[in-house]
């Protein structure tokens, strides 16, 4: 079914970038969050769209499934599984330590009676007696000997449906799999000098780290992910894993690659960051005993320092994220001391420092990759601030300490009145320490964090030392400077392109042939077949699929699935604590939010409408999770999307992610879903409308919301492709049998195609109406 594309996007939406992390930490892990990046910094989007983009921090993420690679001979690293994916029978892998272990693995096809076969093992022709009694599964057998002239013995067979095998060197042993899928387990062979065992592989293979052994076992038992089984995934040489290590000194410029017009330069720099905080203190009106606000605000600091004998002019912009709002109220009288709000940064807060200097590294910082930094930690201690009251002793806010720890670096753009500067944004996480802060002559004491009252403590600046490294694409001519393309321009261009593309997509609805659409809706579209209409290379297609998944991850559909997963988890835990059958039935109905309150249902229409509307929000997700043979709204939506992508002349890899995500959210907004119970049909729409009727007469019957909630939990949910109004019209004008009615209620694609091929105007009008709802 074409809706496979949406399920594939939901299961493969794994990409996370630094801005997602910053927004999540800043909003989800604190309360009363104030985000004030200041007038000089803007990092809403990446500065440009070029190449692989920047590396957000210095953390290396090891891939879960690395490959596929072509057959080769090499010494696999210890503690890594080598996952083998042979396609034909014969020798799959062989390896030896040339002392006391010669080990090979042979693959035998299904249904092989006992026979003698000749295999080439370690350069010798060897005759072995083999068999495979399984009618459906392939058989892997290990053959080994302990002396050069010894005979081979057979060990540890693995009967496999996915036809996958794995080997790992670890802790003086060689580990393999044995048993029968889907219940295969690991076994091992002891050997000396195991780390020097060279292995020759005769099939494509993958590399999986040992800490992901559970995932490796899942692949052995159930097969590789669907995305690995397309013709677009091709194996590459193992040399692709090699990394060219360049010895680099600090404060050095290295030419990584060069052509006639462009060159890649690696800049390594020592760096001295000086910064300070700024604050705003606003006194409230009245008699002078109350303050309305004490808050942080961004500030730019310019300074000079010496780097390798060269004087560097730099400036920094310091801002904070995720502040905590405190208050103090000494009483209700006008002469009682009070502070409506004062900000404090602590463990859930972040400090951002945007840094720029006049060195060569920042002159062409437009196209950047491999960005990394190492910085020291700095401790910031607050000073004292005296609240001058008209009469009485003055309260004093004093103390407070936080330590800034480096937590990542990315590109940013700083704007001034005269110039736009591409700079580096350093992100710091915070920890609190002694001394705590307090307000004298009040009960506020022993609080931790750094308040905004006097964060600099009479210091001119705080200082951090460290280094950074980046690779920048610059003109080969050092006298030419790359024009700055800041993110605002890039985003405005993208919005304009999206606007034009939406108009084109909506106009293409008139050009879709209905019979072809039904055929396309029945195809199992994957990501590569969906996007094949765009002119691009295979590499660009892979990158494009990743970009689509990254954008789709933030869609309403993906968010709903995530929320539903959490709800089901909560329901499962409540089931484990339930003591009655009734409570279990109520809790396990995770598709509804009314299940826990179903016992006190009111008979009013308003209450039933509210409950069915709540259930209807989950029906699309239930249908996606339990795929049926019938056609659904997402099949039509995906087919229309594919057709429009193929017909479009304006779609590009840049605009595709937004278009796919919008289509999943906006195509066919007026949806109705149904569940069938014998001769009774229950329907609920996204707009809260609900009704029940009999199949043979289409006469309405009372709507039992309790029964509907139970059916939604236990029965398949079906898209009402042909709605009740259309069915009644069809019965009144053409007459349909009970079986035809059942087929149309189940959205049987064969029956739909028959009506369309017969040019039935009622069915064609309904499908055309659905196509016209596929608008952006």
UniProtKB/Swiss-Prot annotation:
Residues 510-776 are annotated as: Spike foot. It holds the Pfam family VP4_haemagglut. Residues 65-224 are annotated as: Spike head. One of its GO terms (biological process) is permeabilization of host organelle membrane involved in viral entry into host cell. A motif (YGL motif) lies at residues 448-450. Residues 248-479 are annotated as: Spike body and stalk (antigen domain). Residues 484-518 form a coiled coil. Disulfide bonds join 203-216, 318-380. It comes from the Viruses. Residues 308-310 are annotated as: DGE motif. Residues 389-409 are annotated as: Hydrophobic. The record marks 101, 190 as: Binding to sialic acid. SUPFAM superfamilies: Concanavalin A-like lectins/glucanases, VP4 membrane interaction domain. GO terms for cellular component: host cell endoplasmic reticulum-Golgi intermediate compartment; host cell plasma membrane; host cell rough endoplasmic reticulum; host cytoskeleton; membrane; viral outer capsid. A motif (DGE motif) lies at residues 308-310. The record marks 231-232, 241-242, 247-248 as: Cleavage. Keywords: Capsid protein, Coiled coil, Disulfide bond, Hemagglutinin, Host cell membrane, Host cytoplasm, Host cytoskeleton, Host endoplasmic reticulum, Host membrane, Host-virus interaction, Membrane, Outer capsid protein, Viral attachment to host cell, Viral penetration into host cytoplasm, Viral penetration via permeabilization of host membrane, Virion, Virus entry into host cell. A motif (KID motif) lies at residues 644-646. Belongs to the rotavirus VP4 family. In group A rotaviruses, VP4 defines the P serotype. This is Outer capsid protein VP4. The lineage of its organism: Viruses, Riboviria, Orthornavirae, Duplornaviricota, Resentoviricetes.
